[in-house]
Amino acid sequence: MSENPPTLFSAYKMGNFNLSHRVVLAPMTRCRAINAIPNEALVEYYRQRSTAGGFLITEGTMISPSSAGFPHVPGIFTKEQVEGWKKVVDAAHKEGAVIFCQLWHVGRASHQVYQPGGAAPISSTSKPISKKWEILLPDATYGTYPEPRPLAANEILEVVEDYRVAAINAIEAGFDGIEIHGAHGYLLDQFMKDGINDRTDEYGGSLENRCKFILQVVQAVSAAIATDRVLIRISPAIDHTDAMDSDPRSLGLAVIERLNKLQFKLGSRLAYLHVTQPRYTADGHGQTEAGANGSEEEVAQLMKTWRGAYVGTFICCGGYTRELGLQAVAQGDADLVAFGRYFVSNPDLVLRLKLNAPLNRYDRATFYTHDPVVGYTDYPSLDKGSLL
């Protein structure tokens, strides 16, 4: 007699971690870490969204002073930042959750106002992000992205080291692992996408060369903290901030093939692969909506192709509803499903999805504001007493 297919609420073993359900908190920038230091507001935010056996991925966390591209995002490159994160991690662990830190460098998706000494942001290229897109500045206005400075080959190794040290700091803070942000038009994506990367050295041109930087990061971080604590997020078909590729399907397969080979070489699997699918689109301010970037059938086929190629845990993300999440898991198209905006407005999202209860609407106007409560920790949870 065949077993029933898994659901969003089935248990799952992710490497060494036993999860009680498959609903994941997606990483989301929230701009509440004043002066880049995790504070009590972040402690409460992540505590609210923690469940026994649940899995959380933090917002993008800066690996170095040059990696910033938003106001008041947290870092993990100073002792004070590490100490701040310890409180967040402790709160999540007390609720029984597993929590990973997303390591982030925005590359050219920055501005001189965020850079040490007012320097130009770094990238694979000198091509700026087009004026279709705008960057949120510290005074809450929006500006134009400046021309970046292409990294020299030897400087790339310095950034690899920044990732390695940040990963070590994350483990010191108590995190269960780290996610390398290689998606959404940020630094590592700027090297992988041929619509951005115009280099003629060993980091440009062929798929092999364009994947070199991200694989160096994965190898360095894996050597520092253990392969099964490392995961990677990619978005081959997402064109956020002009991050276009001429053949997203092949790019995704190229990254996956190399990750599979690396896992075999290291003798241990990565924690997971996290893929944002083309249902994710964005307006010029980087605020996302589920939209039709290709037909639903094309979207589904891309994800099926990548999922089928990857050896290991596969997380999907990007505009998922309860129904789409249930379908993805039941059909084997994903092991886990990450939810973003509705986790912002529903700290008890796991319970609401399980009960098929109504969801609080999110307030887009407070996504990137700095109030420690409003639009951050003040969304109501279900009255559990009334459910008994």
UniProtKB/Swiss-Prot annotation:
<feature type="binding site">
    <location>
        <position position="60"/>
    </location>
    <ligand>
        <name>FMN</name>
    </ligand>
</feature>
<dbReference type="InterPro" id="IPR013785">
    <property type="entry name" value="Aldolase_TIM"/>
</dbReference>
<dbReference type="GO" id="GO:0009695">
    <property type="term" value="P:jasmonic acid biosynthetic process"/>
</dbReference>
<comment type="similarity">
    <text>Belongs to the NADH:flavin oxidoreductase/NADH oxidase family.</text>
</comment>
<dbReference type="GO" id="GO:0031408">
    <property type="term" value="P:oxylipin biosynthetic process"/>
</dbReference>
<keyword id="KW-0521">NADP</keyword>
<feature type="binding site">
    <location>
        <begin position="27"/>
        <end position="29"/>
    </location>
    <ligand>
        <name>FMN</name>
    </ligand>
</feature>
<dbReference type="Pfam" id="PF00724">
    <property type="entry name" value="Oxidored_FMN"/>
</dbReference>
<dbReference type="GO" id="GO:0005777">
    <property type="term" value="C:peroxisome"/>
</dbReference>
<dbReference type="GO" id="GO:0005829">
    <property type="term" value="C:cytosol"/>
</dbReference>
<dbReference type="GO" id="GO:0016628">
    <property type="term" value="F:oxidoreductase activity, acting on the CH-CH group of donors, NAD or NADP as acceptor"/>
</dbReference>
<dbReference type="InterPro" id="IPR045247">
    <property type="entry name" value="Oye-like"/>
</dbReference>
<dbReference type="InterPro" id="IPR001155">
    <property type="entry name" value="OxRdtase_FMN_N"/>
</dbReference>
<feature type="active site" description="Proton donor">
    <location>
        <position position="186"/>
    </location>
</feature>
<keyword id="KW-0560">Oxidoreductase</keyword>
<comment type="pathway">
    <text>Sesquiterpene biosynthesis.</text>
</comment>
<feature type="binding site">
    <location>
        <position position="368"/>
    </location>
    <ligand>
        <name>substrate</name>
    </ligand>
</feature>
<keyword id="KW-0963">Cytoplasm</keyword>
<feature type="binding site">
    <location>
        <begin position="181"/>
        <end position="184"/>
    </location>
    <ligand>
        <name>substrate</name>
    </ligand>
</feature>
<feature type="binding site">
    <location>
        <position position="181"/>
    </location>
    <ligand>
        <name>FMN</name>
    </ligand>
</feature>
<dbReference type="GO" id="GO:0010181">
    <property type="term" value="F:FMN binding"/>
</dbReference>
<feature type="binding site">
    <location>
        <position position="233"/>
    </location>
    <ligand>
        <name>FMN</name>
    </ligand>
</feature>
<comment type="function">
    <text>Involved in the biosynthesis of the antimalarial endoperoxide artemisinin. Catalyzes the double bond reduction of artemisinic aldehyde to produce (11R)-dihydroartemisinic aldehyde. Also able to reduce 2-cyclohexen-1-one into cyclohexanone to a lesser extent.</text>
</comment>
<protein>
    <recommendedName>
        <fullName>Artemisinic aldehyde Delta(11(13)) reductase</fullName>
        <ecNumber>1.3.1.92</ecNumber>
    </recommendedName>
</protein>
<feature type="binding site">
    <location>
        <begin position="340"/>
        <end position="341"/>
    </location>
    <ligand>
        <name>FMN</name>
    </ligand>
</feature>
<keyword id="KW-0288">FMN</keyword>
<feature type="binding site">
    <location>
        <position position="279"/>
    </location>
    <ligand>
        <name>substrate</name>
    </ligand>
</feature>
<feature type="short sequence motif" description="Microbody targeting signal">
    <location>
        <begin position="386"/>
        <end position="388"/>
    </location>
</feature>
<keyword id="KW-0285">Flavoprotein</keyword>
<feature type="binding site">
    <location>
        <position position="102"/>
    </location>
    <ligand>
        <name>FMN</name>
    </ligand>
</feature>
<dbReference type="GO" id="GO:0016629">
    <property type="term" value="F:12-oxophytodienoate reductase activity"/>
</dbReference>
<feature type="binding site">
    <location>
        <begin position="317"/>
        <end position="319"/>
    </location>
    <ligand>
        <name>FMN</name>
    </ligand>
</feature>
